[in-house]
Amino acid sequence: MTETGSYKDTVNLPKTNFDMRANAIKREPEIQKFWEENKIFESLSQNNPGELFILHDGPPYANGSLHIGHALNKILKDIINRYQLLQGRKVRYVPGWDCHGLPIELKVLQNLKSAERQNLTPLQLRQKAKEFALATVDNQRQNFKRYGVWGDWDNPYLTLKPEYEAAQIGVFGQMVLKGYIYRGLKPVHWSPSSKTALAEAELEYPEGHTSRSIYAAFPVTSFAEAAKPLLGEYLPDLGVAIWTTTPWTIPGNLAVAVNGDLNYSLVEVSRIGAETQSNFKYLIVAADLVERLAATISAQLTVKATFKGKELEHTTYRHPLFDRESPVVVGGDYITTESGTGLVHTAPGHGQEDYVVGLRYGLPILAPVDDNGDFTQEAGQFAGLNVLGEGNQAVIDALTAAGSLLKEEAYAHKYPYDWRTKKPTIFRATEQWFASVEGFRDEALKAIAAVKWIPAQGENRITPMVAERSDWCISRQRSWGVPIPVFYDEETGEPLLNEETINYVQAIIAEKGSDAWWELSVAELLPESYRNNGRSYRRGTDTMDVWFDSGSSWASVVKQRPELRYPADMYLEGSDQHRGWFQSSLLTSVSVNGIAPYKTVLTHGFVLDEQGRKMSKSEGNVVDPAIIINGGKDQKKEPPYGADVMRLWASSVDYTGDVRLGGNIIKQLNDVRGKIRNTARFLLGSLYDFDPEKNAVQFEEMPQLDKYMLHRIREVFEEVTEAFESFQFFRFFQTVQNFCVVDLSNFYLDVAKDRLYISAPDAFRRRSCQTVIHIALENLARAIAPVLCHTAEDIWQYLPYKTPYKSVFEAGWVQVEEKWHNPELAEFWQQLRQLRTDVNKVLEQARVEKMIGSSLEAKALIYVKDANSRKAIATLNPEVGNGVDELRYLFLTSQVELLDSADKLQDGKYTSQSDSWGIGVVNAEGQKCDRCWNYSTHVGESAEHPLLCERCVPALAGEF
């Protein structure tokens, strides 16, 4: 053959139908269908040989569409579950939903006309709420499945299912029997706009809240014996100065609290420009705050005496607006000199610390405010006024009239609002049901210490929360929830709540669901013995806090389902759950069983936009997971990337803090997926005629380069394993990306093309390379499978040879061999790779200046400065080599000359010098081979193939 180009059909070019484009919008659903039809998840979770692995799902709330925070959470869970499956464990994952509570009630009410709303019975509201919750669950379930999340989607747990509610009542019943549940008056966060008590987790603290704060003085009427000698002479013109940001609570004042260890001063008041004249010649105030108070009330304050706070204990004062005397009491460390006067107005019905101090001193719990936030008759002249509006003003006016007000000023601070209605809340004592945390606090703290927290600071967050928390108010004044199964004696109001009544109600709810509490008569809900015992009962109308619902899931799901195991291996949620689900689950589990319901707790941060700002509709910076997957209205601007890109993002971020996401980040991650697909496509294409059973080369026989590559493969996949084991998925992301681009594309595969294309199909140099490629490809598919689950399966389905596994997930985790480990060889090849990089720079220079087109048109001149290195590198430039471990193949040049002195570099037109070596480039010698495009002085020597070189002639004969 003497025609140029007539040999192009004799080279082994890659062949595969694996698509370079992901085409995820079509391909991902096909792959999910393949998993479903073949029941891959079900069979692995039943038949894997390893231990059980139970990641218990924290239930998202069934009241709207999924947002990117849901996606991050469920994808992180799925990455862990899929990794555990690949490791051979029996992963049982039951997704769940939180279905009760006020937000769902509000959604239902918002959709009704006001006339319908007025006449709604609790049962009708519950029916509508249930329909809404179930519709939301279905919508969210379809979306979660589209993310590629595996789980028991046909049998999820819903907090509204009868078996769930019954188990929850069982937890409540056990806590009752252990004496942890009680009823009491207690100040709770009360929302007048929702007319219900709110949990801490249902509050938010918006920026920009301003209160009307007042300084006032209450007239002192007597001192304790010990203080009389020092302070007695200043009566009756003496007042205790207090400061409050909630003047409406003054009618509930029953004490003034001081810090026993602080210094206080008695000061004489002389007004400078008397704007408000008060009745007091003398005031008591914290010593450190005298100057600040003087400036605030525009008066001159002269210190007459100084003493410790504890000396004021048992002093009495008269309430400025009501005819009653109250004590000065010693409070706690919450009384500081950071603001106010150092004396704290104390209303046990309107504040947590006030309540605790009140209990200690036996003060009544007074809260003259009703459900709407209006003063009751107990508030006398203020009855009927709203405490957050005209009631507040009326109290300030009355204090002014009584000569008690010292100063009023606006005060900006954090104030709790109802997270749903966005309106301010109040602290108000109401009859509520409580779980006494005091009874098992120490056990709870012990349980926390026995859990593994990831990141570790999670333990430092939840520990003080549990150590300092007050008793848990578990009752809510709503109808959409699990009822507190209590009856009240119609005559005495005494609650009826015991083992017999609880078990009876539990059995009814297990059969009929919690609607029965509203549907059945009281007689039907009571055990026989209480039906005709001469008393009549009414049922309670409170439901349980939804945190008690979800906090019982360890009992309703993990313990109750036979395929699961309690305690669960892991809980994984956002870091806001230290005060939410992690804590409510811990408290119920410890109180009933004395242990935490989880062995490990992993938390992640929130998703912010690319600038690190909170996502909000008003900012227009919300990233919708559905749009990432399916694309937006304008598919040019918002293309459909599919679920794998979103999953790749979840693996790329350091989730231990807040994470960022936006259009640019997603685009970059799409490029990374593209690089991984491209690498996989080349690997697949290079194996079209390879059967590992027949063609694989033994490790011992391999050339150095291939042994080095297997060392790298072992190193890379051990690093990836370590990343998954330690839940540091960003390390997986960086390692795999680097391996595909730096080790494979830019190095090994670049060098391999000559071996793969030019050699005879069955040549040793080609089969050895294919063996490495087959190992790299199968391990790459397995390693990306927890994250890029669709891409990994796609690769596996296109393997050109038979494998015993129909899915990559059946193939198990990566497989590397100990014998591949060879640090000395690796060190030598690292040095060669550095040399290759430097040679490429010089070749590039020659290419830019048009001295050469392709690097094969060049001959490289190398001078290695260190004699030992020179000797070692010389072994890779033999007269006759093995066709692999040769510098010419490494550099992709037609020839390489190793120089014994630096002088000869002068021959090269382009040169570079470093500490280790000098490099030059000259034109290659000989003619260009028409088949492999290498230059050789032997082209033309074969009569049969005059256009070919000394490698291609034997290659065509099957000998190279």
Swiss-Prot record:
Annotated residues that bind ATP are located at K617
Query: Could you tell me the keywords of this UniProt record?
Result: Aminoacyl-tRNA synthetase, ATP-binding, Cytoplasm, Ligase, Metal-binding, Nucleotide-binding, Protein biosynthesis, Zinc
Q: Which cofactor does it need?
A: Zn(2+)
Q: Which compartments is it annotated to reside in?
A: Cytoplasm
Q: Give GO terms for biological process.
A: isoleucyl-tRNA aminoacylation
**Self-association and partners:** Monomer.
Name of the protein: Isoleucine--tRNA ligase
* Organism for this UniProt entry: Nostoc sp. (strain PCC 7120 / SAG 25.82 / UTEX 2576)
